[in-house]
């Protein structure tokens, strides 16, 4: 059976557009680089002197900058090319790792977090555009989950490698974590070179049409349930912008060491490696809305386990179930790509970026306030509440729109 699935996966890849395949190669490198350090960013900035509230403010400021810069990315990608925008995003992430590496204060470390948020947001806008322009509607979830399966493999290994390196360099302090950011910078530079040399534009850029505001107006006129989907996007992505509290909570409250935090992240990505492709096939076959509704409770269970965990093993299980959020996010992203005509994907992704950006500004401030005033565990209860609201909104969207 494994051989059959692998063979079908290779056959699927062979018939895809070159841009889709090169983007997978790029993701393999960039995700390893991100996986070395992402789970340690909040801990690193904390080691430089920031507390939970400061972490929230730093993330919120990064969200403001990210929102202002990434809203026009989709529109610019339509006009000047997806390739140029992806190169820009990778360049910003490279600068973020350099800022982390040079940081001697939490403010400079916060600059690194802000730049990372901006660069990551660029990729979140542009990467789905590659899938949107190269994959057929009836196999889009399968293709996106296949990409996620293949490119999640480095993230299985990277956190454990990071834990070993941190231990070797002196432990979970600023000096022990700093070398990882230099390694990540080198990896991101390689990913940038791959895109620069080999990634073609999946669709030729066109400078026809009006301004970015006119593009947004066209999306609302010609799209399907656009306003409701934007509200859904805002609610459903709150966990993305409070995720930095998970490793911080594991270390500060549960006393997790570098290896436990690394294994939590590896377990998170194991969900993608082993379940992404089956989830994609089942979503395309039996319904995307049903699949999101099935996956979300597992993510909520992960948050409960994180709070009540009596030992390291339960923390790692929580990390595994936390990965179900990503499985659901990819499935719902495929729904979003089909709500507007293909020629409007740039403007549509820009609007989605705006909605996520607003959340990235507000959510960290709310999270910091909740942590300081009510208690750390209430941050995760708040996240569970957002997912309940998300499912309520999703249920109001007809199955004819979500393909089941």
Region locations from a protein language model:
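Helix-loop boundary and gating motifs at the non-cytosolic
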Residues: 6-65, 225-265
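Helix-to-loop junctions at the C-terminal end of transmembrane segments
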Residues: 69-81, 166, 275-287, 371
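Juxtamembrane intracellular "pre-TM" segments in multi-pass secondary transporters
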Residues: 1-20, 200-230
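Intracellular juxtamembrane helix-capping segments at the cytosolic ends
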Residues: 122-135, 327-340
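Central cavity-lining transmembrane alpha-helices of secondary-active solute carriers
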Residues: 57-74, 266-278
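C-terminal membrane-cytosol helix-exit motif in multi-pass small-molecule transporters
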Residues: 185-205, 390-398
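Hydrophobic core of transmembrane alpha-helices in multi-pass small-molecule transporters
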Residues: 28, 96, 107-123, 234, ...
């Amino acid at each position: 059976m494994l051989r059959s699935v692998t063979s079908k996966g290779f056959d699927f890849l062979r018939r895809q557009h070159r841009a889709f395949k090169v983007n997978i190669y790029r993701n393999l490198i960039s995700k390893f680089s991100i996986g070395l350090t992402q789970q340690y960013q909040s801990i690193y900035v904390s080691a430089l002197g920031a507390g939970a509230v400061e972490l929230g403010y730093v993330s919120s400021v990064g969200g403001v900058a990210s929102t202002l810069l990434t809203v026009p990315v989709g529109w610019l990608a339509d006009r000047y090319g997806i390739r140029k925008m992806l190169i820009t995003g990778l360049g910003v992430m490279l600068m973020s790792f350099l800022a982390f590496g040079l940081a001697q204060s939490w403010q400079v470390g916060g600059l690194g977090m802000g730049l990372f948020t901006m660069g990551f947001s660029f990729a979140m806008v542009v990467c789905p555009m590659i899938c949107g322009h190269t994959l057929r509607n009836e196999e889009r979830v399968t293709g996106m989950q296949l990409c996620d399966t293949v490119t999640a493999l480095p993230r299985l290994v990277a956190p454990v490698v990071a834990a070993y390196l941190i231990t070797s360099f002196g432990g979970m302090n600023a000096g022990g974590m700093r070398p990882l950011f230099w390694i990540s910078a080198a990896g991101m530079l390689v990913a940038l070179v791959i895109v620069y040399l080999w990634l073609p534009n999946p669709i030729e850029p066109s400078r026809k049409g009006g301004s970015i505001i006119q593009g947004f107006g066209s999306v609302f006129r010609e799209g399907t349930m656009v306003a409701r989907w934007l509200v859904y996007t805002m609610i459903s992505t709150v966990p993305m912008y409070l995720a930095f509290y998970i490793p911080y909570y594991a270390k500060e409250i549960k006393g997790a060491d570098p290896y436990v935090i690394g294994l939590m992240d590896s377990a998170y990505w194991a969900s993608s490696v082993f379940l992404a492709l089956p989830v994609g096939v089942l979503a395309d076959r039996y319904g995307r809305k049903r699949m999101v509704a099935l996956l979300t409770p597992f993510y909520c269970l992960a948050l409960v386990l994180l709070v009540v965990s009596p030992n390291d093993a339960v923390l790692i299980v929580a990390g595994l179930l936390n990965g179900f959020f990503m499985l659901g996010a990819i499935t719902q992203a495929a729904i979003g790509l089909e709500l507007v005509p293909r020629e409007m994907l740039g403007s549509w992704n820009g609007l989605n970026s705006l909605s996520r950006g607003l959340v990235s500004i507000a959510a960290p401030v709310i999270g910091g306030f909740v942590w300081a005033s009510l208690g750390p565990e209430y941050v995760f209860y708040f996240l569970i509440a957002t997912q309940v609201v998300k499912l309520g909104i999703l249920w109001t969207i007809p199955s004819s729109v979500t393909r089941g």
